């Protein structure tokens, strides 16, 4: 599926595979904002501008664009690529980018691979039990420094107890 970007392109706006927006969801044309599946934004896990046609990203972009159109000074810097699917009776979830050092575990039923560098979680691939994948997604989206939590515990048994008491309260 390719987004229809002709409207913005025809009036001189910057485009690539999608409409280029900045961290305030503004296009290259002053006072014109865009949000959703046809926008390219910065993937915080890789630093690259890309299309990420995903509901959570579109929702947050819409909030950002709406706030800025109403005069606020709001920044959206939490876009990450994510996918989740059920396949052959297994749940599969991925998020972020697959670069950096690797933590890997597999027990025959479940598979987990975490990618991290520069004291941050960059991405993950989980097959099987994806119940706690939201914790990893939040760590990526919030750019949480890994030295502020028990990273070994987060890798093996993700849960709120791995976070400092300050973060949990």
Stretch-by-stretch model annotation:
Residues 61, 65-68, 160-169:
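An exposure/low-complexity boundary signal
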Residues 12-13, 70, 141:
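A generic structural signal for secondary-structure junctions
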Residues 108-167:
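C-terminal auxiliary extensions adjacent to catalytic cores
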Residues 18, 77-79, 149:
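Residue-level detector of family-conserved "landmark" positions at structurally sensitive sites
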Residues 4, 38-134:
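Mid-to-C-terminal Rossmann-like scaffold of FAD/NAD(P)H-dependent oxidoreductases
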Residues 1-64, 155:
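FAD-site-proximal beta/loop scaffold in flavoenzymes
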């Amino acid at each position: 599926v390719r987004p229809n970007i002709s409207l913005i392109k025809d009036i001189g706006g910057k485009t690539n595979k999608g409409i280029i927006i900045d961290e305030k969801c503004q296009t290259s044309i002053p006072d014109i904002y865009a949000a959703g599946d046809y926008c390219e934004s910065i993937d915080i896990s890789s630093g690259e501008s890309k299309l990420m046609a995903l509901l959570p990203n579109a929702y947050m972009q819409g909030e950002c664009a709406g706030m800025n159109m109403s005069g606020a000074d709001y920044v959206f810097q939490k876009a990450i690529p994510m996918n989740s699917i059920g396949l052959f009776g297994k749940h599969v979830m991925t998020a972020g980018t697959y670069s950096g050092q690797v933590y890997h575990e597999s027990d025959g039923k479940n598979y987990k691979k975490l990618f991290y560098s520069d004291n941050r979680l960059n991405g993950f691939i989980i097959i099987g039990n994806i119940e706690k994948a939201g914790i990893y997604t939040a760590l990526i989206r919030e750019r949480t420094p890994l030295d502020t939590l028990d990273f070994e515990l987060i890798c093996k048994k993700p849960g709120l107890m791995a976070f400092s008491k300050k973060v949990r309260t």
